Design a protein with these regions (language model features):
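Surface-exposed extracellular loop regions of Gram-negative outer-membrane beta-barrel proteins
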Residues: 247-258, 389, 457, 483-526, ...
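Structural signature of Gram-negative outer-membrane beta-barrels, strongest in the C-terminal barrel
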Residues: 357, 374-388, 425-548, 572, ...
Length: 721
């Protein structure tokens, strides 16, 4: 019934080492994570030479034995991406996983929802995912798909999202934007090297958004500063800081009618449960990172980094949930945690102010390259410390009335007179780890071997601050990979990685409410091929299998009717295809497809086996192309297609959201006014105004349905001053 995510218990350490690429010359300078080159989809720029973040270290895209995708600044600008859900629509391996409008959003990679405590990173360091992640200060977004045990330690097995910040440069840009709803957007990007050894980059954005959902308009202010300081001939210090404040009413998700039927005749502009007294959800976030590097020689480098991330959420919502108080559910024949068969739903006055999440991290690392006979080594080793805390006040979560999904106007009810209680520590987690990885090169082969030893100490507390759980675990997480350079254009690889994540919490409607299940070990095997047919195009294919113990609410004879258990295995087997770069001098393409089979077996509940798991479509595809018109210099036509197969919405697989295709289109025009470049972007998402369910994800054990946005046009213009 709680509309919020439960306090995230997965608390992992920083990204692991990114070792030197052994195939590079011995005197090649090492690049820092914040200097990773994005895969640019434009002519004359080799797409395959970009180093990228991955669990197996830094190297060119072709030599990385993992599925990694980079969404660069050019693509983010062309698609006018502003939210995490919009970001996910650009990669077929990603999908929404409880992503309401007006609230912080979460996504899934390869069918596994990310942990909001450890799955999102800025410049390689974990940040609190319980924030509205801004993109104005981001140069590229790196998507590591699959297990990242060495890179992140204790975490969900789907992967990680790494936001790479902009570095100081000579730039002065102003962007103005609006959309078909009347939103107003302004952003500035200013950079300058104040001296040959010290540079700054300042980004800011102010947004007043008019949402397509009634009564859900919002605002956002964002500020960031990045500095680079070259210390002597061998040292460098990079510091990044950003702050954002936002306020917007959160839109509740729909639920199945009577637990068996999708809602029909849904108006996407309707705000479920709207009450005039409902305040917006306020989210204030601060993120700080610092990295110091020192080159002992051309082959050895030390790296010391630290980060701090804080998110404060004032959670206020008239929350639409279940039908416990509705007449259609009074006899108990319909589960109370779903909407009633006729569309009735209960409204709760939910308030949880000062919900505070903090991440603090420190890491020391040594990277080096050396030879032993005919074998070249690129070694990385180090240690890190990660701490995470969650402080929350006792919330108000009171029933105030019942409405129906087809009400033209939601009935108004009086709010609860209760007030939130005092703040108390809910989670205190610490993770200490040591790691090492060696990339050994011999002829056309590379063997990567390493691991991470992690020790976790975590305490959870109830609403009053009374201890209720103390978890301790120590695990070694090995990983290895073999890369074969078949030709100058083709590399093939096979990899094996082990990971660990903490157990889930039993939902309130199960017989063991609030119980945390044991930590789960996961295993992943992946085989891939990467093909670089030219200097500006990359093609990739990856076949993977990831498995972990299955944790779920099992039907039984208890008074609650369900008990949350760990039984059987959950296995995700899939094929991913990617293409990125220039098909011709005028045509660029970013495309991906995912074919995923996610099943449970030996779970002890036959109805829950033999079919796709919830919120994991079997097939996803996304295509975005841009064609430069030959008869108008600087004018490009953009087009996109997004597809998802039917999406299971119940544990027994009997109800699914239908498959959908969505088409996007746009224009991009670059010209100059005097000596100043100007770029216009016009994009139309969901061109044919298709209705579809974009998300059947869960929060606190309950499942929700979120409709996709209707047709929306966006216009922006960027002036280089």
């Amino acid at each position: 019934m709680n509309r919020c995510f439960r306090p995230t218990l997965l608390s992992a350490a920083l990204c692991a080492a990114l070792p030197l690429h052994a195939n590079e010359p011995a005197d090649a300078p090492e690049r820092s994570p914040t200097e990773l080159a994005a895969v640019r989809v434009q002519a004359h720029q080799p797409a395959a030479t970009a180093t990228q973040t991955s669990s197996f270290g830094a190297g060119d895209w072709k030599s990385t034995p993992a599925s990694v995708n980079v969404l660069d600044r050019d693509l983010l600008d062309s698609r006018q991406v502003r939210t995490l859900s919009e970001l996910a629509s650009n990669d077929a391996s990603l999908g929404d996983s409880y992503a309401p409008v007006g609230y912080y959003q979460n996504i899934a990679i390869r069918g596994f929802p990310l942990d909001t405590g450890t799955g999102y990173r800025f410049n390689g360091l974990a940040i609190s995912g319980e924030q509205r992640l801004a993109l104005e200060n981001i140069q590229s977004v790196e998507i590591l798909k699959g297990e990242a045990g060495l890179a992140a330690g204790v975490m969900a097995p789907g992967g990680i999202i790494n936001y790479v910040g902009k570095r100081p440069a000579e730039v002065r840009n102003v962007t103005l934007g609006t959309d078909s709803e009347g939103s107003r957007y302004t952003a500035v990007d200013l950079g300058h090297w104040l001296s040959p050894r010290f540079g700054v980059r300042f980004n800011a954005a102010w947004e007043d958004s008019d949402s397509y959902i009634d009564h859900a308009d919002g605002r956002r202010n964002f500020y960031s500063l990045a500095t680079d300081w070259l210390i002597g001939e061998r040292g460098k210090l990079e510091v990044d800081a950003n702050y954002q404040t936002s306020a917007q009413r959160s839109a509740s998700g729909y639920q199945l009618l009577g637990a068996t039927e999708l809602p029909r005749g849904v108006d996407r502009k309707h705000l479920l449960g709207y009450q005039a007294w409902q305040r917006p959800v306020g989210i204030d976030s601060t993120n700080l990172t610092a990295l110091h590097t020192y080159d002992f020689s051309t082959r050895w480098q030390s790296r010391v980094s630290a980060s701090y991330s804080r998110s404060v959420i004032d959670d206020n919502v008239a929350f639409a949930y279940g039908c416990y108080y509705a007449a259609g559910c009074a006899d108990g024949s319909v589960p109370g945690n779903y909407f009633a068969p006729n569309g009735d739903y209960d409204i709760y006055d939910y308030r949880s102010p000062d919900d505070t999440r903090r991440n603090l991290e420190f890491r020391g690392e040594l990277r080096g390259a050396f030879d032993t006979g005919a074998v070249s080594h690129a070694l990385s080793m180090g240690a890190d410390r990660f701490e995470r805390t969650v402080d929350k006040r006792r919330n108000v979560n009171e029933y105030v009335g019942t409405a129906n999904i087809h009400d033209p106007q939601v009935p108004q009810f009086a709010p609860s007179p209760l007030m939130p209680g005092a703040s108390a520590r809910r989670l205190d987690s610490a993770q200490t780890a040591v790691f090492a990885l060696d990339r050994m090169s011999f002829g056309d082969w590379q063997w990567l071997a390493g691991g991470r030893f992690v020790r976790l100490d975590e305490r959870a507390y109830d609403k009053r601050g009374t201890p209720e759980r103390h978890s301790r675990l120590s695990r070694f997480l090995p990983q290895t990979a073999l890369v074969w350079k078949a030709t100058d254009e083709v590399n093939a690889y096979v990899s094996y990685v082990r990971g660990i994540s903490l157990g889930q919490e039993a939902p309130f409607w199960t017989s063991n409410e609030g119980t945390f299940l044991p930590a789960v070990l996961s295993r992943q095997v992946e085989v891939g091929v990467k093909f670089v047919p030219g200097d500006a195009l990359t093609l990739g294919a990856a076949l993977f299998r990831t498995s972990q113990p299955f944790q779920y609410a099992k039907p039984d004879g208890s008074d609650a009717g369900y008990t949350f258990v760990e039984e059987g295995q959950q296995t995700h087997t899939g094929l991913e295809l990617t293409a990125q770069g220039q098909l011709s001098e005028r045509l660029s393409l970013t495309a991906s497809a995912s074919f995923l089979r996610a099943r449970a077996r030996d779970a002890g509940t036959p109805d829950y086996e033999g079919h796709q798991l919830i919120n994991v479509p079997k097939t996803r595809a996304t295509v975005h192309a841009e064609y430069q018109l030959p008869f108008v210099t600087g004018l490009g036509v953009t087009g996109g297609w997004r597809y998802a197969a039917s999406n299971v919405a119940t544990a027994d697989g009997r109800v699914s959201a239908p498959a959908y295709s969505v088409f996007d289109a746009g224009l991009r025009f670059k010209h100059q006014v005097g000596e100043h470049p100007v770029t216009w972007n016009l994009s139309v998402d969901n061109l044919f105004n298709r209705f579809y369910w974009r998300d059947t994800g869960s929060s606190s054990g309950d499942y929700y349905l979120f409709p996709g946005a209707p047709r929306q046009a966006r216009l922006s213009v960027t002036f280089a001053l």
